Amino acid sequence: MLPATFKLCAGISYRHTRNMTGLRKNAMVAIHHELNMLAGPNPSSWISHVRRRSSLLSSRIEEEQGYNEAEVSYVKQGEEALQKSISILGDQDGWTTEIIAANGDKVLSKVLPDVGKVFKLEVLLDQRSDNLYGELVGNMEQMGDWNPNVKEVKILQKIGQETMVTHEVSGPTPGNVVGPRDFVSVRCAKRRGSTCFLAGMSTQHPTMPEQRGVVRAENGPTCIVMRPSADDPNKTKFTWLLSIDLKGWIPKTIINKVLSQTQVDFANHLRQRMADNSVSKEMAPAC
């Protein structure tokens, strides 16, 4: 989206495999190794939650038995995006404050080797996490209706219940500082217990080559994490990790300002969307 929604490095090559047993073994070894690395002496509460639920990052391998080579690759890419995102979010050191809004919304950033500059939005939303998940995942293609930073989101392909490939076109920026961008992304959506995840990274898809007049940008890993507030389960602690390469000759100072402000704007647009949804439900006639 630009914001929300999530995109990451296109043109990444992945080794395809037809051996599902090998895929299961390799994926689980890598995932558990990563989670062990995340476990420092004082792991954050949500990482501890992830470790307790070992099924968080594991795909339902039995659902993949009928997948072809390309579908298996997309599932694997989505899992990798989630794994990398959790690793980044689990490291609390080295973050620099970019924005602190009057309502407490905060954007932080840090520079990572082989990834570049990443941004992290941290907000508290007056919505239950399952409602937010339903809007961002279940109504994903409607995002352009309420987020002016997004012109269109289209699901190109679904693989099982947790993986999809999407095409997103960004909306105009003030003063057209950044021209039209689009993204092709693989997304991994998971709900485990009370915690919801939406991770993604750039990929390629045969039905969506680069479009004339639009710069194909890259993103990833990106991830939204939604979990109930410890103080009030009707509120959600919302974290959004954003990593984007907009391509083109754009000064870094402008990119940093655009991306951090995009995250703050997204939080406000999402609040308004959820408020509008609540009003619509209240006004709906009883059956």
Curated annotation (Swiss-Prot):
Pathway: Steroid metabolism; cholesterol metabolism. The keyword Transport applies. Keywords: Lipid transport, Lipid-binding, Mitochondrion, Steroidogenesis, Transit peptide, Transport. It catalyses: cholesterol(in) = cholesterol(out). Residues 1-61 form a transit peptide. SUPFAM superfamilies: Bet v1-like. It is found in: Mitochondrion. The keyword Hydrolase does not apply. One of its GO terms (molecular function) is cholesterol binding. Pfam families: START. Residues 66-279 form the START domain. PANTHER family: STEROIDOGENIC ACUTE REGULATORY PROTEIN, MITOCHONDRIAL. May interact with TSPO. Plays a key role in steroid hormone synthesis by enhancing the metabolism of cholesterol into pregnenolone. Mediates the transfer of cholesterol from the outer mitochondrial membrane to the inner mitochondrial membrane where it is cleaved to pregnenolone. This is Steroidogenic acute regulatory protein, mitochondrial.
